[in-house]
Design a protein with these regions (language model features):
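Enzymes that bind and transform nitrogen-containing heteroaromatic metabolites
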Residues: 9-256
């Protein structure tokens, strides 16, 4: 795999300390992410991007903000330049107060050079449609969100959300149904939450895992990054690359 680590690091990444080896040369996270080979013939390539503490907590104080750092946010932004669609569950949209997807000029240019649209499209999954039409995520009419829901979704909420988003009823909202709806995509990035990602893991619809390990121990009863039915058999992943931040560790896993 091409690391894309040669040459000067662009100004927007100079605050980050992401390196190929501890104390080694800085790499450009965007170049690295755009260089990885991705794609499969039968369905979109699915990436999960998550941060966890050393002791496995994926949610602290209701979200992941407490365990992020600057390097993680830099890598998060680089990974967001990759997909056609960003898929996220409604609970995470509420907990993290999602905003409309936007990318800086450099990431937009990298996407256009790769044959992608300037900005990935945000897709929110919810069976209950328990979302506030006035939420920040719906604040940019030029970045209209798609909401995927099931046949039993409440009609009143469907009508209200249709004013600010494209709401689509599916026969079911299993990972297979979601990927079938998004079948024209090459890459889908799942940003959670743990329940949504757990369903993808259990269904075997995982191709890549971008995992940030934050140097914290929190104990408590926090859920893991994948929560729900067990994968049977467990999904075997291969460690493809390790990068080092000033504090955090970045692991890229792919299916063998």
């Amino acid at each position: 795999m091409d690391a894309g680590g040669g040459g000067a690091v662009p100004a927007r990444y100079r605050r980050s300390m992401i390196r190929e080896t501890p104390g080694g040369e800085q790499i450009d996270p965007l170049e690295a992410q755009m260089s990885y080979p991705r794609g499969r013939p039968d369905r979109p390539w699915v990436i999960g991007n998550f941060v966890t503490t050393i002791d496995g907590a994926a949610v602290v104080d209701g979200g992941s903000t407490a365990i992020n750092d600057d390097d993680d946010m830099t890598m998060f932004g680089a990974i967001r330049a990759v997909p056609d669609f960003i898929l996220v569950g409604a609970e995470t949209v509420r907990a993290e107060n999602y905003r409309p997807i936007d990318l800086d000029e450099r990431r937009r240019r990298a996407r256009l050079e790769a044959g992608l649209e300037e900005v990935p499209h945000l897709v929110v999954v919810t069976r209950s449609l328990d979302l506030d039409p006035k939420a920040r995520v719906f604040g940019d009419p030029k970045r209209r969100v798609t909401i995927l829901t099931g046949e039993s979704a409440p009609a009143e909420r469907f009508a209200a959300l249709s004013e600010v988003a494209d709401v689509v009823r599916l026969d079911a909202t299993t990972p297979g149904d979601l990927l079938h709806y998004l079948r024209m995509a090459r890459v889908v990035l799942c940003e959670g939450g743990p329940g949504t990602w757990g369903q993808f893991v259990a269904a075997g619809h995982v191709d890549e895992m971008a995992l940030t390990v934050s140097p914290m121990l929190v104990s408590g009863v926090s859920v893991r990054l994948a929560h729900g039915p067990a994968a049977d058999p467990p999904l075997e992943m291969r460690l493809d690359r390790t990068l080092y931040g000033d504090r955090s560790l970045f692991l890229r896993y792919v299916r063998p």
